[in-house]
Amino acid sequence: MEGREMKITDLKFEKIKIKLKKPFVISRGATEYCESVLVKITTDEGYYGFGEATPSRSVTGESIDSVTFVLKTFKEILIGQDPLAIERIHYILNKAIAGNTAAKAAVDIALYDIKGKVMQEPLYKLLGGFENKVQTDITIGIGAPQEMANEAKEMVARGFNILKIKTGIDLKNDVEAIRLIRKSVGDNVRLKIDANQGWNVHDTLTAIKMMENYNVEAVEQPLADWDFDGSALLRKKADMKIILDESIHNAHDAIHAMKKDSADMINIKLMKSGGLYEAEKIDAIAESAGINCMVGCMVETKVALTAGASLVAAKRNITDADLDSFMYYEEFEGIKGGFEVKGDTIILSDKPGLGIEINM
């Protein structure tokens, strides 16, 4: 006799918009709000899970409106499905609608939250359980060089030991910012830069040469997302690690990067990958090729951040994290639990699933 399958009975969602403390500027534009769609999936056995979609027009090709439209379609598809059959659900959703990875991530995260509650285990243990805490960097957005240096110094005083500096608009400004930041924070703080596709090969090599005295350990996505050959060339010519972010959305992209020798590290984001299910595949491919991963974020709430931090904590091969968007806005009172922060360390809850509660 076959066991009875649990069934999804409802999917509801709500849009949220949280004003940032100040605009967050990168080479591709500025952001003034954390805009997300929170999702709740409920089942006929009383279990429920929360998820989040934080779309990006320039990265995932989605907007808040497109996410809500797609989630309405997903609701029709998901009613009656077994929430623990995560691979089957991804297959069904991918057949129904291509892309739309932030919307899929919201569903995926909620399903893993349910699975953790059913198994009575926190998500980080469900995914691998390597440890329960994560050291994150803090990102400094583009601005006047001295202002960036002042912000960097403030973040180090708050306990952050790894800084990721946004670059890619003006090379002279970028180099001056790095010079002033290194001067203000001293030699013991790790520095990375992120151009968000703002440079070409020549610009990148020039920037690396000009920054050689400031102990910058890595440059993230300096080139266009399609330029795997250019990234491979940089790895040969530059004395700095090359991290791929926008180039890597899924496992197929990861395989392509490995074949091209394009990356020293891959930045996984749940909104690009469609959630944890595909993110685990990306990490497994990278690990098999001897390449470490990191997990980054959009400007997300605690829901997606907890999912991302759980993945980092779970996997030995994921050595770095850029899960800092909780620093950009005042704490959103509607989301409780998930993790606490001490200095630059995210300490995950031991409650089942995400360990989060939302009144929705």
Residue spans of the language-model regions?
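Shared catalytic-loop signature of beta/alpha-barrel
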Residues: 69, 215, 226-243, 248-343
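Structural signal for terminal/edge beta-strands and the immediately following C-terminal loop/tail
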Residues: 281, 340-360
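Conserved, mostly hydrophobic/aromatic
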Residues: 8, 39, 46, 107, ...
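Structured beta-strand/loop patches that form or line metal/cofactor-binding pockets in enzymes
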Residues: 3-45, 50, 54-57, 330-332
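Metal-dependent enolase-superfamily TIM-barrel catalytic cores that perform enediolate-based chemistry
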Residues: 125-238
